[in-house]
Each structure stands twice: as structure tokens, then as C-alpha cells.
């Protein structure tokens, strides 16, 4: 075996150092792209929404398991009433085209359909638990994400890159890990009374959520957050109130009211109200799709709280699932999607995710935000 000459050894050393420097610069570039202040802020906002959803799940489960109270429509009705009292009345005192009566005159039927989609999405998902399994609900509820992306493509004219589809796949892989952890931990102990009906309810509910979220993104970016919440509060109160009298009046009559049950209802309503109030703000600076990816962690937060409140069994797969979902969420937020305008429009294309969307740029520059005249 021949010994390496000093000349060749000296030549290989700079090449090795160059390779190390190249790898280091690549890692540094990736780190700067993935861990910017704006992406970290987006992550924090998404997890704030997840905690709101976690609060609604914990209070609902506590009502169901400890007090045998199963009234999802009543709980939703209280939330819609709060939205009505705050945002609908706010619209009533607006002037011009933003006034409540003017909005109703021009677009009442559109907001009726939006309110119906939002109310029934909430109701169908909760009702599905009576028929199918926890695993089915967790997995099939993710069906709303591809539906949301498809609706965003055609309605909002969002254009995705390969990295976005990879990120969504990674997030769904994290959900699969969470479901596997549930099965191993023994939480999947309910076979369901009619799995097919339950699965159909989940798919319908997830699809209606997607419709509601796309409409929400359009309205908060083109019109205003107050208009969306005010109209959802108005029509949600009417629709859920009617449905409440039809499907839950017997369940409500059987409730043995005390201060603990009342406190749980108040806690649920506050969590739901915060979720509805903050979600448009987050969607405005990101997108409906990124928000839905971020709140996939809500079930995991509920599981972590359930370790103490409901004596769930812990599994290391929950930590792995949380990590995988967050990796997918960061990947999605790292690259902005592109929004194409109709051919006849002279408006330049804008991005619709992260810090690059038009709404946030207007906020940062201090310019007034333009409002579209149509929904």
C-alpha cells in the first residue's frame, strides 16, 4: 500500500474544509429560513388557537363524563350569542356600506349559507362521536385539509408549491402517529353504534369546516373581520337556536344545574369566543390552510391535560406526534403560497401565507386596507 504524498494530503485538506464550510452555510441558510421571528410568531398564534380548542374539548368532556351533560348545540348557541352581542351590535352602529342593515340588504342569503355551514360543521363532528370511533374522527377530520386546499385553489386562487404538499403530508403523518398512540394507550375502547353513519358525519362536518374557513379567509382579507364575526354571530344564533329547540330541548330540561356546571358552560363559551375572535386575525396574516395545520396539535394538548384530569395513559408517541406536526407546520410556513389574480384584473399578485400576505403588509406600512364591494 503506497503512502500518501504530502502534496496530495495538502490538496485534500482544503477540499474537506470547503465541504464542511459548504454544509455549514447550507444549514445556516435553512435555519435562517425556518426560524425567523415571523414564522415563530405564526407558530405561537397557531398554538394559541390550539389551546382555545383544547379548552372547549376539556370542558365538553368534563360535562359529559362527570355530569352526563351532552348539549353541543346549546354550547354553540351560547358562543353565537356572544358573537352577536359583541360583533353584530358593532356592525349595527357602523355607517355606510359597513352598516348591518346595508350588509343584510345586499348579502343576507350568502351569510345565511355561511352561518348554516358553520353551525352544522360544529354539530356534525360532535354528533359523530356517538356513532363511530375516536380514531375515525381524528383521521377523517383531516379530510378537511385537502378539501380546504382545493377550495382555496379555485376560490381564493392560491397556488401551492411542492414543499406545501410535503408539509401537509408530514402533518398528516403526525396525526397518524397520534392515532397510533391512542390505540396503544387503550383510548380506542368504543367501537361505535354505527360506524358508517359516524364516518359520513365526520366527512360532511370536515367539508363544511373547509367551506366556512375559505369564506372566512376571503371575508377577513377582502372585507373585514367585524363583518365576518357579526354575520356569523347573527345567523349562527338564529340557526343554532332553532336547531336547539328541535334536537336538544329534552337534554337541556334534564340538566341538574349548579354552579360547577354553569362554570363549565362559561369556560366553554369563553374558549369558543376567543377562538372565533382570534382566528380571523391569524388567518389574515397567514391563510386558512396554515391555521388548520397549526391546530392539529389541539388534540395533543387535550391528551396532555387528560393525563391529569381523566387519567389517560401516557405514550412517548404523543411527543413524537407533536414534533412531527410542528415540523410540517414550519415547513408549510417557510415558503409563501402565490395568489394569482383573474386575467382581467390589473391588481398585482400577492402571497397569502406568513408575513407576505397583503393584509399584514398594509398593517406594517400603516396604509388603509381596501375593502371589496362584493363577498
Swiss-Prot record:
Listed transmembrane segments: 39-59, 73-93, 108-126, 136-156, 165-185, 195-215, 227-247, 263-283, 290-310, 314-334
Coiled coil location: none
Keyword Transport: yes
A GO molecular-function annotation: transmembrane transporter activity
Entry superkingdom: Eukaryota
Residues that bear N-acetylmethionine: 1
Compartment list: Membrane
Main location: membrane
GO CC entries: membrane
Keyword match Repeat: no
Keyword annotations from UniProtKB, A to Z: Acetylation, Membrane, Phosphoprotein, Transmembrane, Transmembrane helix, Transport
Entries under PANTHER family matching the protein: DUF914-RELATED, SOLUTE CARRIER FAMILY 35 MEMBER F2
Entry's family note: Belongs to the SLC35F solute transporter family.
The protein's name: Solute carrier family 35 member F2
Species name: Mus musculus (Mouse)
Amino acid at each position: 500500500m503506497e503512502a500518501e504524498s504530502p502534496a496530495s494530503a495538502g490538496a485534500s485538506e482544503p477540499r474537506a474544509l470547503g465541504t464542511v464550510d459548504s454544509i455549514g452555510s447550507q444549514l445556516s441558510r435553512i435555519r435562517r429560513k425556518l426560524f425567523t421571528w415571523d414564522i415563530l410568531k405564526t407558530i405561537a398564534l397557531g398554538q394559541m388557537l390550539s389551546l382555545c380548542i383544547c379548552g372547549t374539548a376539556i370542558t365538553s368532556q368534563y360535562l359529559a363524563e362527570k355530569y352526563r351533560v351532552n348539549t353541543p348545540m346549546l354550547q354553540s348557541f351560547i358562543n353565537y350569542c356572544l358573537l352577536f352581542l359583541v360583533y353584530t351590535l358593532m356592525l349595527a352602529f357602523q355607517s355606510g356600506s359597513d352598516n348591518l342593515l346595508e350588509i343584510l340588504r345586499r348579502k343576507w342569503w350568502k351569510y345565511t349559507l355561511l352561518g348554516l355551514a358553520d353551525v352544522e360543521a360544529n354539530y356534525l363532528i360532535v354528533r359523530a362521536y356517538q356513532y363511530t370511533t375516536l380514531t375515525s374522527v381524528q383521521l377523517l377530520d383531516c379530510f378537511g385539509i385537502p378539501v380546504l386546499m382545493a377550495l382555496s385553489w379555485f376560490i381564493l386562487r392560491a397556488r401551492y408549491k411542492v414543499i406545501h404538499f410535503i408539509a401537509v403530508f408530514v402533518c398528516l403523518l403526525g396525526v397518524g402517529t397520534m392515532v397510533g398512540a391512542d390505540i396503544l394507550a387503550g383510548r380506542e375502547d368504543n367501537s361505535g353504534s354505527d360506524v358508517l353513519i359516524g364516518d359520513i358525519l365526520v366527512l360532511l362536518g370536515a367539508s363544511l369546516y373547509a367551506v366556512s374557513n375559505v369564506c372566512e379567509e376571503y371575508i377577513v382579507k377582502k372585507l373585514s373581520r367585524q363583518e365576518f364575526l357579526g354575520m356569523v354571530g347573527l345567523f349562527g344564533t338564529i340557526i343554532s337556536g332553532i336547531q336547539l329547540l328541535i334536537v336538544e330541548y329534552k337534554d337541556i330540561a334534564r340538566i341538574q344545574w349548579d354552579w360547577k356546571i354553569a362554570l363549565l358552560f362559561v369556560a366553554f363559551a369563553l374558549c369558543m369566543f376567543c377562538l372565533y375572535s382570534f382566528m380571523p386575525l391569524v388567518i389574515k396574516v397567514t391563510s386558512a390552510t396554515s391555521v388548520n395545520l397549526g391546530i392539529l396539535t389541539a388534540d395533543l394538548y387535550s391528551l396532555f391535560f387528560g393525563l391529569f384530569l381523566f387519567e389517560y395513559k401516557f405514550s412517548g408517541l404523543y411527543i413524537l406526534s407533536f414534533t412531527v406536526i410542528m415540523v410540517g407546520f414550519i415547513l408549510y410556513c417557510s415558503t409563501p403560497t402565490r395568489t394569482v389574480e383573474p386575467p382581467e384584473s390589473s391588481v398585482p399578485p400577492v402571497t397569502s401565507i406568513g408575513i407576505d400576505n397583503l393584509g399584514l403588509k398594509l398593517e406594517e406600512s400603516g396604509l388603509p386596507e381596501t375593502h371589496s364591494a362584493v363577498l
